[in-house]
Amino acid sequence: MTTKKTQALHALLRQVMEQHIAFNKHLGLKVESFDPAAPRLRFDMRPELVGNPKRQILHGGVISATLDVVGGLAIMLSLAEEMDGTPETFPNIGTIDLRVDYLRPGRGKYFIATGRIVRKGSRIAVIHMEMHNDQGELIATGGAAYVVG
């Protein structure tokens, strides 16, 4: 894919991920890296994302949703490389299974989620995701299967 085409695709994906998907916008998700091997999302801790007011920790649903989004982004970037970055030809992507392991309380000023493709076949992709806080502590891991097509 040419640099100009890559930049245009990244701008489009950023716009879709950050502005057009209302829930992503509500969570404050920002794309930090379009690296196909390890895309990265970031969001800041805010009062409306707290799941336990007494302990002031991140809601588990925010963690799982963010891991799901970064998994989907990993697939989109992989498909972009295969399809020469033409979004119109992208197949539909849907989560068919998502597992999250909550390893530590979601404390931090901000959080980073990354995704890595474990296996991608003609119809199913398997992704491993991780979420770290601003101190670099691993707070959750996820594994997901997505239908592609």
Predicted regions and their residues:
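Extreme N-terminal tail/first-helix region
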Residues: 1-21
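HotDog/MaoC-like acyl-thioester-processing domains
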Residues: 3-7, 76, 105-149
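N-terminal structural module
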Residues: 14-39
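Residue-level preference for beta-strand/loop junctions
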Residues: 23, 37, 92-94, 109, ...
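Short structured motifs
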Residues: 25-31, 97-101, 113, 142
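Catalytic strand-loop segment that frames the active site of acyl-thioester-processing enzymes
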Residues: 30-58
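Hot-dog-fold acyl-thioester-processing enzymes
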Residues: 49-74
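Hydrophobic beta-strand-centered segment that forms part of the acyl-chain substrate-binding groove
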Residues: 74-112, 117
